[in-house]
Amino acid sequence: MSKRSLSSLGAEDLCGKRVLVRVDFNVPLGDEGQITDDTRIRAALPTINDLLDKSARVILSAHFGRPKGEVNETMRLTAVAQRLSELLGKTVVKTESCIGAEAKSKVDAMSNGDVVLLENVRFISGEEKNDTEFAKELASLAEVYVNDAFGAAHRAHASTEGVTKFLSPCVAGYLMEKELKYLQGAIDQPKSPLAAIVGGSKVSSKIGVLESLIDKCDKIIVGGGMIFTFYKARGLSVGNSLVEEDKLELASALEKKAKEKGVEFLLPTDVVLADNFSPDANSKLSKVDAISEGWMGLDIGSESVELFQNALKDCKTVIWNGPMGVFEFEKFANGTNAIANTLAELSAQGCCTIIGGGDSVAAVEKAGLAKNMSHISTGGGASLELLEGKVLPGVSALDDA
């Protein structure tokens, strides 16, 4: 699905124009209300700076948290406006509401090259309902629409989908374009062999991804808590490990489907067990067919790491979504860290490595290897849905290229 990008609009199209840019500024805040990680703000800078270079009037729209359609003082975008001002080296004017007379007057007072940040769109109940009247009023502030919020592209909300009915052109920003290029590209035209590493604690949250990837991949590597559902489905004893009893048949069916399609489907051969779920639990290494009663698996073992590394050696594209174990606990982070290091090495050899959002991004950043990967996705749910082959409303609403 090829969409029109901001790069198709020159200064002659944008000079003096009011441009509504949907960004993803849903950043983590500390106890004092300070921003603890500004990655998402920095990710929007190429789009914002390009618009400023083309003398546009930039009106930013973003959500923060889940205020459920009413004003919540702890979810205002004040800290974001301040940080963005520092990054841009110019004052970003913030409105008190995203619509209404005050917002309109601040937008009307803009000159070319000015930036206004509209207050949290989710303070208005019409945002998540994709209310037409709200979308129309939001759109009335601008003339052109740019969506650079890949992290919210799987939502059909007023600011991601509704406004496109009232503005033209509607194009993808540079972050959105990059996300689609890598994630869509990896699925539609990968350099093969293509491997997917799927981790995380639950099969249920990754069913769609696994089903879709079995149709596209040469190899699938499974790690994280979900492996125990596969083991139990094979008739193995898993001790106190996490199992989704209602997904046993599905686990068997996924393995069977992979086999029928000639896809290499790899599960760990050994695991690190713990006697309870805590960072300082007693631990021991065990083969997967010899898991002790009363113990639970919290990481993949060293033999499994080697197995996975060998499987990945010849791959030209690797997508990773979900950790190999409870990487938040130092004792059970080895498997996840080893995979992160392996992918960094593969990247250096020319393999396209894509970290598909969520916890794997946190794991790669914790290991200090983010810069070594080909692409780190900024979307959690959006990345998953794209990998599942779903159409993202925020993307489909944009003009075709």
From Swiss-Prot:
It is an enzyme of class 2 (transferase). The keyword Kinase applies. GO terms for molecular function: ADP binding; ATP binding; phosphoglycerate kinase activity. Pathway: Carbohydrate degradation; glycolysis; pyruvate from D-glyceraldehyde 3-phosphate: step 2/5. Pfam families: PGK (PF00162). Monomer. InterPro entries: Phosphoglycerate_kinase, Phosphoglycerate_kinase_CS, Phosphoglycerate_kinase_N, Phosphoglycerate_kinase_sf. Keywords: ATP-binding, Cytoplasm, Glycolysis, Kinase, Nucleotide-binding, Transferase. Belongs to the phosphoglycerate kinase family. ATP binds at K206, G297, E328, G357, G358, D359, S360. This is Phosphoglycerate kinase.
